[in-house]
Amino acid sequence: MSSVCDVCGKGPGFGMSVSHSHRRTRRRWNPNIQTVRTVVGGTPKRLNVCASCIKAGKVSRA
């Protein structure tokens, strides 16, 4: 499944996981992507939308 929002384009953030002994390994923080049925151009369509776009009302559910 895609980890990019179809509305705002938000994608994963990258960084390091740091243990107590300060060993560092690469990791990624994925946005909270939900599959939402919405009306685009008069036809219902499934979009991958982040939770912040759903909360902000940028997407109307079908």
Swiss-Prot record:
Pfam families: Ribosomal_L28
Gene3D superfamilies the record matches: Ribosomal protein L28/L24 (2.30.170.40)
Cellular-component GO terms for this entry: ribonucleoprotein complex; ribosome
InterPro entries: Bacterial_rp_bL28 (IPR050096), Ribosomal_bL28 (IPR026569), Ribosomal_bL28/bL31-like_sf (IPR034704), Ribosomal_bL28_bact-type (IPR001383), Ribosomal_bL28_sf (IPR037147)
Residues passing through the membrane, by range: none
Keywords: Ribonucleoprotein, Ribosomal protein
GO molecular function list: structural constituent of ribosome
HAMAP family in the record: Ribosomal_bL28
PANTHER family recorded: 50S RIBOSOMAL PROTEIN L28 (PTHR39080), LARGE RIBOSOMAL SUBUNIT PROTEIN BL28A (PTHR39080:SF1)
Family: Belongs to the bacterial ribosomal protein bL28 family.
Name of protein: Large ribosomal subunit protein bL28
Gene: rpmB
